């Protein structure tokens, strides 16, 4: 075994710009160097926000939350660089395609976005 984590997650890990990341079941984001597997940064500001799947878009990590916000996070620093409310309902799924990304809320409404 090369690496393991005790984090419990609903989503598969993401790898972006040399960072391996996990969103835990309680919405804490933990990242590790994809080369050495040492801790990189941890982000606890989204704990209990019921984050959606992580999605890569234009070099950022995107996540949706239970209040209908989408957050863009720098994968190298863990700093939230943008945030936008797109729904009054929980964002359940994010999908990125070329120059746009799509968010689906719990009422199955589809939002097409870009930045």
Predicted feature descriptions by range:
Residues 1-115:
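Extracytoplasmic/lumenal domain signature
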């Amino acid at each position: 075994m090369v690496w393991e984590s005790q984090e419990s997650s609903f989503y598969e890990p993401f790898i972006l710009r040399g960072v391996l990341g996990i969103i835990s079941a309680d919405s804490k984001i933990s990242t590790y160097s994809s080369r050495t597997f040492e801790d990189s940064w941890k982000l606890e500001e989204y704990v209990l926000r019921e984050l959606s799947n992580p999605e890569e878009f234009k070099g950022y990590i995107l996540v949706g939350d239970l209040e209908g916000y989408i957050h863009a996070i720098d994968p190298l620093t863990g700093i939230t660089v943008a945030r936008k409310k797109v729904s009054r309902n929980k964002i359940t799924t994010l999908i990125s395609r070329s120059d746009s990304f799509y968010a689906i809320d719990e009422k199955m409404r589809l939002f097409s976005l870009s930045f």
